[in-house]
C-alpha cells in the first residue's frame, strides 16, 4: 500500500452490518473507525463517510457531506465489499438472459440433479439468476474422425473439434432484439465446448454488443475450464453481479472530486488478491469481504508465530468463517454460495451456521444451536427488539459480555444499551423446557440453573465450530493441535480459549486490530493478476516444451498487466501452476512447483510432477505410479507486492496492568470474580492470568481459567491455553453432554470417512464418495453414521447385529469382518461392509463396533459393474461374503479374499472380479478407516471413561427414539382431531404387477407404530427383490423426513416401530434371490408407499433410471433425475433426484470427452408432472447419440404404473425408454433390457414426472414454490465435501 509520502492510504472492509476503516495517515500513524454500513438518515455511502470523517479528524477542517471530497491528500483506497454477496443473497442483481446451445435449455436449472437437503420433501426450486433463456442453433463436438465428418478445428487445449452446426446469427438477431424490447441488457453466453473453442461464443457476444447490450459475459472468458454446468453458473453470476458492482463503483467515485482519477483504487477479490476497480467482476467478488481477514492473519499471526500453521477463526453475527494458512493461500476452484456454484479461484473459507446471532433451541432432549439466525433485525433478545434467544444472549447471561462496553444503539429508537434482562427472560423460556424434560422425561434428573443452561448452549456452539476445523486439518493429514488459532471478528474472542482447548491447541493469537482484521488485511494485501487457460496434454517430457511456452505466455500477460498498474518489475513476482490428475480419475490438484526447482526431467518452470506426487501422497496416503498424469489447466498468478509497513506499535507500559473493574463471570465451577482490562491501556510484556476480560471498542476477549494472556511486543494478545480441567461426567443423562456427545460421535464417523476417501483408490469411493462409515454400540445398534446415504441408513446395523449373532464368542482382538450378503444386512453385492469389533482392557466382549460400507465398481458376475438388468439369482451378481474374516489375528487375509473375489468365474456365464487391485486397495482403506474410528473412540473413552461413553451411546439412541415418538403422537393427534382412525394404509405396484402393501397402526399412549407389509407380492424371478435391510433403510429415511428437522440418525429411530415383513416376499426374499434392482428401484416404491400412507406428499418419479453403456474398452453408468411429488403447500421440484438416491450426473462436456456419445438433449419434460393444486415436478428428456458400437442396458421403473397423486392430485407421467435407429425406426425398449447399439443410433430417455397434490380445479391461489434459502449458512471445501457425499 505504497504511494507518495504525506498522503493517506485507506483500507476499508464494507461488511453487511458494519464498515471498518483502517487508515495510514501522513507520518505513519494509524486511525481506525467502525460505522454502520447502512445509515441512510446520515450518509449515502459508508466507505465515503469513513474517509470523510478521518480526513476531517486529521485536518481539523469541517468537510460537508453533500460535497465531493478533495482527493489531493489521498494516495490509495483499497476495499473489500459484500455488495456482490448481498446482491446474490437477496437476488437483487441485473436482469439477465441466458444464451445456451440448443437442447440444453434447462441445463442450469437441473445442474447436478442432486438435491441440497437430503430429507426435505419440499425440495426447493433452484432460483436461477437468469430471467429468460434463448437456445442458440449451433453445435461443436469433439472430433473422432467418423465417416462424413467435416474438417476439424483445433481448440486451445490442443483437442480437435468438429463444427457440426455453425452459429445461426441471422436467426439469433431477432431473438436478441426481442430481449432488448423487454428491457434485458445483460447476457450470459454458455455454449458447449467453448472452454477450448470459443469462436461461437465470441460471434454471439459481438452481435449482442452491436445490438446494444450493455454487459455480455462469455463463459469462455469468465472461466475457461471444462464442465459447462459450473462454467455456465459462473457466467450467469458474472452477468448478474458485474453491472451491480459497476453501479456501486460509479456511485462511490461520484463522492470524490475528479471521480478518483488520480487515486489508486483497488478491490479485494475472492482469491485474496487486489484488482483495479475497472476490472472488478461479479464472479470474482463473492468472497471479497471474508478474504481480507485471511490475508490479515496470514500477514500478521503467521509471521509473528514463526511460521507455525494458523487456523483462522472469524466469528460474526450469523456465521463463523474457518480457514487455514501454512505459508501459502489454500484455494478452491469451485464452491457454492447462495445456491450458485462458481468456478473461479477462491480462498478456502469454510462457513458454518454458528455465530453470535445463532438461535438456541431445546428439541426432544437435545441442546441445538442454529442454523437459524436472529439476523441484524430484530437481532438477539438483548437488542431490545423482541428478537429470539441466541448465543450472544447466553454469553451475556454468563457475564462474558459487558453492556457498558457497547454503545447505546439498541431498542426501537436505537438509543439504549444492551439488555441483560431481555436475555435472561428469553433464556428462561428455554430453561423451562429443559427442566420440564429433566423432571418429567424418561430419566428424571435435577433441574438446571439459568447459567447452567446458558453454559450448555455455549459448549454446544463451541463443539459445532470445532467440527469443520477438524475436517479442515485432520482430513488433509494435518494435526489441529500443531496450529495457532488466530481469532478475529466481533464474537470470536469469547469462544477462542474453549475452541483451542477442545482441539488441543496451546496458543491463541488475537491481533490488536482483530475487530478490523479484514480491513487490515486489505492494507497488507498484494495486487494480483491471474491468467489461466485450459489444457489437454499429458505431463510427460515430450510436452514440457509446450507447457513452458504456455506458462511463459501467461507470465508475460500477468507482468504486463501489473506494470500497467504502476508496479516496477522489481516488485512483481509470478507463480506458475498446473492442474494435474491421474489419467482415468477426476481428482485434479492445482499444484505449484515453487518448492520443487526444475530438473532435467521437468519443465523449466519447475518440477510439477514431484509437487503433484508429494501433495497427492499427503492428502490421500498413496500414489498411482503406473498411471500417466494429465494436465487439465495451466495458470499463472502474478503479484505486485504491497509496501505498507505498520508503524502504530503501542509503546511499552511501565508497572503492572491496571484493572478497570471487577465483574462476575460464570464458568464450569460457578461464578468467579473476574478482572476487566482495557486493551488500550495494556503494554508490551503485561501478563494477565485467567479468568479475565479484555475489552476494546470492537471486541471482548475472554481469557478462561487456567489460561494466561500476554501482550506481545507488537501489541497483540497471545493466550497460552492451559489443559482443560477434567470434568466429572456421570452415566446419567445430561442434555448438555448429550448434545456434545452427539457432535463427537458424528465427528468420529466423518473423520473415518475422510480417511477412507483419502486412502481408497477407486473412482466410486475416492471421487463419487459412495460409502458410509458408522459407529455402533456394544449390541450392534447404530450410534452415528456419516454421510447420510439413504440406502445405508438402516442396513449397516443389520449387518453388524448379524455378525454378533453369527460369531458370538468367536470374535477376537485383531479380527476384521467382511460381509455383503443380503441375508446378513447387505443391500446389494457391490456394497462391501468391513466391520471391526473393538475390545477394551478388562472386557471379554467387544465394547463397540466400527464399520465402513463402500460401493466397489466390480465384484464379478454376468456383467461388468456387477449391476446386471436381467439377473435371476444372487450368484450372477458377483462375489458373496456372508461372514468372512478379512483380517484374522491382525493379518490381512489377501490370499483368501482374492480367491473369494475370483470365485464367481467358476459359475457358467459369469466372471470373477474384473478389478482385483482396486478391490484389495479399497478393502485395506476400509480397514484403515475403521482403525481411525477405534483410535478416536479410544480418545473419547480416555477422556470420559468406558461406562460414560457407552451410556451416551444409549442416550443418543434414546434421543432419536424420543423424536420419532413425538412425531407419531403428533400425527395421531392430528388425525383424531379430524375424526379419522389411527390406522393408515397405502398400496402401490411394481411394473411387473407385484404389489407393495403397507398398513400402519399408531399407538398414541406409547408413541409407537406397527408397520405391516403383509400382502406384498412374493419374491420375483428377476432382480427387483429387496432385502429386509433395504426396507428398514427406507423406513428410517421416511421417519426422518416426517420428523422434519435434524435428529441423530441411529438405531433409536426404529425403536418405536415394529416392522412386519412376510418371509419369502419381494421385501424379504430367499437367500439366493437376485437383488440388484431391489436396491435401486424397489426401495423407491417402498418410500412412496410409506409417505403415501402418511399423506406426506404425492409419489415422486419412483425410479433411479439406471443407464449402463459399455464395450470392450469402455464402461459408463448413470442415474437420471425425474419429477418430485408435490405436497401440502409446495409444487414438486422438476429434474431432481428424490428419496433413496441423490447421485450427481456427469457434466455434458466430460461425458462427451470421455465416452463415444453426443448428448443431443438434456432438458425438462414439460407437462409430465401431475396436475393439482400443487403441481408435480416434471421429468427429464435425455437423448444420447452413439458414436461407437456398444451394449446399452436400462434398469428402470414407473414405465407401467404412474406416480400417484394425492388429495385429488393427478398422477405424473410414466417414463419411456425409446431407441431410435439410424434408419429412423423407433423401438420402445420397455423398462428393463440390454440391447446392442450402433453409430448413429439415439437413446431417448423420458423420465417420470411427480404426482400432483390437491384438486387441480381448486380456485385457491397457488403459493410460490419453495426457493433456495437466501442465506448461505455453510460454504467452503468442508461443506462441498459433505454435499458431495450425500449426492450418491
From Swiss-Prot:
<dbReference type="GO" id="GO:0017168">
    <property type="term" value="F:5-oxoprolinase (ATP-hydrolyzing) activity"/>
</dbReference>
<feature type="modified residue" description="Phosphothreonine">
    <location>
        <position position="151"/>
    </location>
</feature>
<comment type="similarity">
    <text>Belongs to the oxoprolinase family.</text>
</comment>
<dbReference type="Pfam" id="PF19278">
    <property type="entry name" value="Hydant_A_C"/>
</dbReference>
<dbReference type="GO" id="GO:0005829">
    <property type="term" value="C:cytosol"/>
</dbReference>
<dbReference type="GO" id="GO:0005524">
    <property type="term" value="F:ATP binding"/>
</dbReference>
<comment type="function">
    <text>Catalyzes the cleavage of 5-oxo-L-proline to form L-glutamate coupled to the hydrolysis of ATP to ADP and inorganic phosphate.</text>
</comment>
<keyword id="KW-0963">Cytoplasm</keyword>
<dbReference type="InterPro" id="IPR002821">
    <property type="entry name" value="Hydantoinase_A"/>
</dbReference>
<keyword id="KW-0547">Nucleotide-binding</keyword>
<keyword id="KW-0597">Phosphoprotein</keyword>
<dbReference type="GO" id="GO:0042802">
    <property type="term" value="F:identical protein binding"/>
</dbReference>
<feature type="region of interest" description="Disordered">
    <location>
        <begin position="1249"/>
        <end position="1269"/>
    </location>
</feature>
<comment type="subunit">
    <text>Homodimer.</text>
</comment>
<dbReference type="InterPro" id="IPR003692">
    <property type="entry name" value="Hydantoinase_B"/>
</dbReference>
<keyword id="KW-0378">Hydrolase</keyword>
<feature type="modified residue" description="Phosphoserine">
    <location>
        <position position="1265"/>
    </location>
</feature>
<dbReference type="InterPro" id="IPR045079">
    <property type="entry name" value="Oxoprolinase-like"/>
</dbReference>
<dbReference type="Pfam" id="PF02538">
    <property type="entry name" value="Hydantoinase_B"/>
</dbReference>
<keyword id="KW-0067">ATP-binding</keyword>
<dbReference type="GO" id="GO:0006749">
    <property type="term" value="P:glutathione metabolic process"/>
</dbReference>
<dbReference type="InterPro" id="IPR049517">
    <property type="entry name" value="ACX-like_C"/>
</dbReference>
<protein>
    <recommendedName>
        <fullName>5-oxoprolinase</fullName>
        <ecNumber>3.5.2.9</ecNumber>
    </recommendedName>
</protein>
<dbReference type="Pfam" id="PF01968">
    <property type="entry name" value="Hydantoinase_A"/>
</dbReference>
<dbReference type="Pfam" id="PF05378">
    <property type="entry name" value="Hydant_A_N"/>
</dbReference>
<dbReference type="InterPro" id="IPR008040">
    <property type="entry name" value="Hydant_A_N"/>
</dbReference>
